[in-house]
Amino acid sequence: MPSARLLVLFGSQTGTAQDVSERLGREARRRQLSCRVEELDSYPVVNLINEPLVIFVCATTGQGDPPDNMKSFWRFIFRRSLPSTALRQMDFAVLGLGDSSYAKFNFVAKKLHRRLLQLGGSALLPVCLGDDQHELGPDAAIDPWLQDLWEKVLGPHPVPLNLDLSPPGVLWPSKFTLQFLKDTPSSGPEELCAAGTDPQGPPSELQPFLAPMVSNQRVTGPSHFQDVRLIEFDISGSGISFAAGDLVLIQPENTASHVQQFCQALGLDPEQHFTLQPREPGVTCPTRLPQPCSVRRLVSQYLDIASVPRRSFFELLACLSPHELEREKLWEFGSARGQEELCEYCTRPRRTALEVLCDFPHTAAAVPPDYLLDLLPLIRPRAFSIASSLRAHPSRLQILVAVVQYQTRLREPRRGLCSSWLASLDPAQGPVRVPLWVRSGGLTFPKTPDVPVIMVGPGTGVAPFRAAIQERVAQGETGNVLFFGCRRRDQDFYWEAEWEQLQARGCLTLVTAFSREQEQKVYVQHRLRALGPLVWELLDGRGAHFYLAGNAKYMPADVCDTLLSIFREEGGLSDPDAAAYLAQLQRTLRFQTETWA
């Protein structure tokens, strides 16, 4: 009896959905199921009509948005021309990953589940709603859901009687092998370009532009709790162009001290070079990784040793461990019953993969190099809103970066990999180059002259609006209204002098909210409500566009509630009509958001 064919497709923004998908793949193979795990946008979506059994694993980002690596699939699957019987041969299940503190919790998974039903698919289970806010994380929902899933899958597709279920402790072969070279290659392996890429092509993830850093300036007061940087890059000769609302992606690196510590813990020679080979046909090597590559470069620029490891990290370490006590503890962390203890040890204090390896020294020293890419995720690029316009700053690109640093119960402060790396770079001490490329963002501004724009950007959320205002002022457009919020005027009022100069010229209406300068906190939504008549007149009378950028947790919902109250009180709309009015603004792209966690 041939084994059933299972396809796992994932859409992942931070790597969690990919990690869950690979876990699904391992568990399927334990059950003798033929299984492929693929990124949604890499899979030829028209082939779904031939798939009998598909598990979709998808995260929800921002305000109910799909991850970047499933956006093409998302557009295709919601085409109105698709027939209602298109997927009638397919059994499916949807596993969602989200955060219940956001208004559109697991919106992508829920909407995909409904759409697959509309196209004739048969759901094996209700959609799984993994929640980052749960004390045990998404696994609290995933573990029982997977038990039900395998029962459903193995009903119509039972394990052949002559085959046994592989025990969970079996060590599967690594995805890749590292072939170490006897001699150091002579052809410049440290150039930042992946083998086989076209150096003449436009800057991209495969071929980033090494942009010289021109300046790195702290723009918050010395006593302010947060270090925020205005960083400028020279993009002359790069071929990079961008518009207001676009994003720049930056590929960060691990610190030299962490790289050295990692190599010592695993007994690796950082100067040794290797080539990477896939173990199975059909598996491709990471496209960004050069061939050949040094161990130092692999650890510095590719392996995310500063990430908080997921459950699969502990499962694999347990399989690799030769030390009985360490192995038992790792098995506990990797098991369903050990998730509360894992949360206490790792997730809650944000302990990094490097710190875990140092806590399990006998295991770390026994990790075969072939398993490095199975054990650790690749460093992901970080996206920043571009904070300048080429019209105002030709050949320059500026970003506003809040340096992430916070304390947990661990002795060492937790630091954001990319923001801390950028903050550490000082062009005054010598040339600094940063790998970057640009992509279209989620905000598009009106091309028609004289269309007013209302922009709400508290904190670093103001960055894309500075680019938009510079661009619009250069084109002679004066209908710019900016609501900016921060803690104190003298500590974190970004670009104060620039805004005041534009306001004096009649190019900008600036409305500020300084939350800590009076006994009762004042936020942007309070200032928005106070100017309700102006907001309603601009939106309903003059066809203004409304933009919102900043932290996704509470502010967007508060601003939307404020808008609804303005529509009711200034426009005389009923509750349903106010909600419909806001929905219409969203549909026509007159209400746009760019938010982040």
From Swiss-Prot:
<dbReference type="Pfam" id="PF00175">
    <property type="entry name" value="NAD_binding_1"/>
</dbReference>
<dbReference type="InterPro" id="IPR001433">
    <property type="entry name" value="OxRdtase_FAD/NAD-bd"/>
</dbReference>
<dbReference type="InterPro" id="IPR001709">
    <property type="entry name" value="Flavoprot_Pyr_Nucl_cyt_Rdtase"/>
</dbReference>
<comment type="similarity">
    <text>Belongs to the NADPH-dependent diflavin oxidoreductase NDOR1 family.</text>
</comment>
<feature type="binding site">
    <location>
        <begin position="515"/>
        <end position="516"/>
    </location>
    <ligand>
        <name>NADP(+)</name>
    </ligand>
</feature>
<dbReference type="GO" id="GO:0009055">
    <property type="term" value="F:electron transfer activity"/>
</dbReference>
<dbReference type="GO" id="GO:0010181">
    <property type="term" value="F:FMN binding"/>
</dbReference>
<feature type="binding site">
    <location>
        <begin position="382"/>
        <end position="385"/>
    </location>
    <ligand>
        <name>FAD</name>
    </ligand>
</feature>
<dbReference type="InterPro" id="IPR028879">
    <property type="entry name" value="NDOR1"/>
</dbReference>
<dbReference type="GO" id="GO:0050661">
    <property type="term" value="F:NADP binding"/>
</dbReference>
<keyword id="KW-0560">Oxidoreductase</keyword>
<keyword id="KW-0274">FAD</keyword>
<keyword id="KW-0521">NADP</keyword>
<dbReference type="GO" id="GO:0005829">
    <property type="term" value="C:cytosol"/>
</dbReference>
<feature type="binding site">
    <location>
        <begin position="416"/>
        <end position="419"/>
    </location>
    <ligand>
        <name>FAD</name>
    </ligand>
</feature>
<dbReference type="GO" id="GO:0050660">
    <property type="term" value="F:flavin adenine dinucleotide binding"/>
</dbReference>
<keyword id="KW-0963">Cytoplasm</keyword>
<dbReference type="InterPro" id="IPR039261">
    <property type="entry name" value="FNR_nucleotide-bd"/>
</dbReference>
<dbReference type="InterPro" id="IPR003097">
    <property type="entry name" value="CysJ-like_FAD-binding"/>
</dbReference>
<dbReference type="GO" id="GO:0003958">
    <property type="term" value="F:NADPH-hemoprotein reductase activity"/>
</dbReference>
<dbReference type="InterPro" id="IPR023173">
    <property type="entry name" value="NADPH_Cyt_P450_Rdtase_alpha"/>
</dbReference>
<feature type="binding site">
    <location>
        <position position="558"/>
    </location>
    <ligand>
        <name>NADP(+)</name>
    </ligand>
</feature>
<dbReference type="InterPro" id="IPR017927">
    <property type="entry name" value="FAD-bd_FR_type"/>
</dbReference>
<dbReference type="Pfam" id="PF00258">
    <property type="entry name" value="Flavodoxin_1"/>
</dbReference>
<dbReference type="GO" id="GO:0016491">
    <property type="term" value="F:oxidoreductase activity"/>
</dbReference>
<dbReference type="InterPro" id="IPR008254">
    <property type="entry name" value="Flavodoxin/NO_synth"/>
</dbReference>
<feature type="binding site">
    <location>
        <position position="460"/>
    </location>
    <ligand>
        <name>NADP(+)</name>
    </ligand>
</feature>
<dbReference type="GO" id="GO:0016653">
    <property type="term" value="F:oxidoreductase activity, acting on NAD(P)H, heme protein as acceptor"/>
</dbReference>
<protein>
    <recommendedName>
        <fullName>NADPH-dependent diflavin oxidoreductase 1</fullName>
        <ecNumber>1.18.1.-</ecNumber>
    </recommendedName>
</protein>
<feature type="binding site">
    <location>
        <begin position="59"/>
        <end position="62"/>
    </location>
    <ligand>
        <name>FMN</name>
    </ligand>
</feature>
<feature type="binding site">
    <location>
        <position position="132"/>
    </location>
    <ligand>
        <name>FMN</name>
    </ligand>
</feature>
<feature type="binding site">
    <location>
        <position position="596"/>
    </location>
    <ligand>
        <name>FAD</name>
    </ligand>
</feature>
<comment type="subunit">
    <text>Interacts with CIAPIN1; as part of the cytosolic iron-sulfur (Fe-S) protein assembly (CIA) machinery. Interacts with DCPS.</text>
</comment>
<dbReference type="GO" id="GO:0048471">
    <property type="term" value="C:perinuclear region of cytoplasm"/>
</dbReference>
<keyword id="KW-0288">FMN</keyword>
<dbReference type="GO" id="GO:0160246">
    <property type="term" value="F:NADPH-iron-sulfur [2Fe-2S] protein oxidoreductase activity"/>
</dbReference>
<dbReference type="InterPro" id="IPR029039">
    <property type="entry name" value="Flavoprotein-like_sf"/>
</dbReference>
<keyword id="KW-0285">Flavoprotein</keyword>
<feature type="domain" description="Flavodoxin-like">
    <location>
        <begin position="6"/>
        <end position="150"/>
    </location>
</feature>
<dbReference type="InterPro" id="IPR017938">
    <property type="entry name" value="Riboflavin_synthase-like_b-brl"/>
</dbReference>
<dbReference type="GO" id="GO:0016226">
    <property type="term" value="P:iron-sulfur cluster assembly"/>
</dbReference>
<feature type="binding site">
    <location>
        <begin position="12"/>
        <end position="17"/>
    </location>
    <ligand>
        <name>FMN</name>
    </ligand>
</feature>
